[in-house]
């Protein structure tokens, strides 16, 4: 445990993964890898950090899987919790503690928290009608019900949230609800629940959010959309069979029965950060030290999550903390967007996913295998908008950057040091302008990279680190030591001296993203006493991030890499990549859902016949798109301005996931011109642009060369 007397402590949490399935690369890119890079950077700075995570083992998602597989919830979580924990460790996640919400400590902590809020008058108690499955004879909470989202029209929205537009929902708000257990149409039945009065807390929440202008725009934009709609009370208890039980004494205080009622998973899950911190402190032999990280104003609390969890970490959990009164509020919630795979939405149900455990097994023989995926994902993080991972892109990152740039620079430097300078650091004498410029650039990089990590621009941080390796390669090429070792031995010595200093800097700067390779590099250059980026105690007098820009290897320092140093990275061959792509396609094909292929696919069935009179009611006009721009808080929509010849129309088109604004401007399209205007996301859509949808879901504009305003018949 770090020094609890430090002037500021840093508590970092990563979203608790549901213990109902394995981890995939979308999870890693959303919350876990950015958190780990941030924490490792902070540890290298010598900060007092507690990095907390754990398995979310309560709630409907666990119960649903247990019902589907005819197993108990306990069996489900006992299967996936150790698998998730172990694969995180194999991947290099450096948690101080990884807990689980089925623990006794968590149950006690959650119930105590619930009890305090109830005693403080922090809940509203309401009796109303909820959806009930008459066949299963149970209330349908959260993901036990599916239906049409009232906000965006997505037809497979869950009872607690629409995963298409991110709207926070309750089951009774769904249109055309259906039980996911029996497919029955639910009926209404009366029940009583505790509600968190988010509406009453909105002014406090708005003031708090407004005090953090440094937060990411995608996070603040989503929060603001909820503020604009007006927050509503949210039920934080459920009538289900699995979860943290409502405390008997609290129920009795209100004349109610606690039996059959549990605390909503999104009330108990973030409390899992607190209970895990308690368990971590107890494990360190300081059971009360958890309060230093949760109840001391000198703590900086940062939540790393995916965008689907913004409402819970930016509104619900802060509301709970405010109502309790004893806890610090989050300092930042740097949520990421979604990661796509090979140009398609990642989908576990369709088999369109890269599972972490499969990657680790398939690439077990590759040198620094976890680092390869860490780097490829870190350069593709969906920080402000959705991003795409492809296996060919992975190969390019490994071969073109890790092997050809970073690895090549290190290998050439070590080889020259062994061959021409007896495996030692040669002295730097009378440095040239190129030598000084390289050292000056090296001195600047720690601050540049550090600022990017601090501002949660992780991709920029990794890019700037690799840029130093690129500059090192260019410097090596420009100074031509293969010539100067004969023509000007001191110039050659200067090149190798400076290059070795850059290698030392890179061995620290690359530590957050490439911990295995960075450690290997430090071994090869004999750089010792470097501060650790893992939860271990810092070595006394350790070299840290702040030292990375200075020369760290004195003249005469031995370089223990050996006369023929092994390349730091291996290149990934084409067959390996093709095997991964084929695995994806084969798995999707088994489920008849391969999104990457348009062959042998069923076309959508024809709609029912309409009369000629019905068709003639459509007023179809030719038009030209003159403007296209994203719609705030609506990932699927572009706002178009279309010239119909006789007037300009504003039209919202659901093509943003496939077409960039620049791809749309200038298109000559067909518009349904007599469609009734519709208000969406603060804009009035005054028509519809016709699109063809191919069997694989790709949109293709229906175009025309007719004059703007011409009738299309």
Swiss-Prot record:
GO terms for biological process: methionyl-tRNA aminoacylation. Binds 1 zinc ion per subunit. ATP binds at residue 348. Belongs to the class-I aminoacyl-tRNA synthetase family. MetG type 1 subfamily. It is an enzyme of class 6 (ligase). It is found in: Cytoplasm. Its EC number is 6.1.1.10. It comes from Salinibacter ruber (strain DSM 13855 / M31). Keywords: Aminoacyl-tRNA synthetase, ATP-binding, Cytoplasm, Ligase, Metal-binding, Nucleotide-binding, Protein biosynthesis, RNA-binding, tRNA-binding, Zinc. HAMAP family: Met_tRNA_synth_type1 (MF_00098). It comes from the Bacteria. Residues 614-713 form the tRNA-binding domain. Zn(2+) binds at residues 149, 152, 162, 165. It holds the Pfam family tRNA-synt_1g. Is required not only for elongation of protein synthesis but also for the initiation of all mRNA translation through initiator tRNA(fMet) aminoacylation. It catalyses: tRNA(Met) + L-methionine + ATP = L-methionyl-tRNA(Met) + AMP + diphosphate. This is Methionine--tRNA ligase.
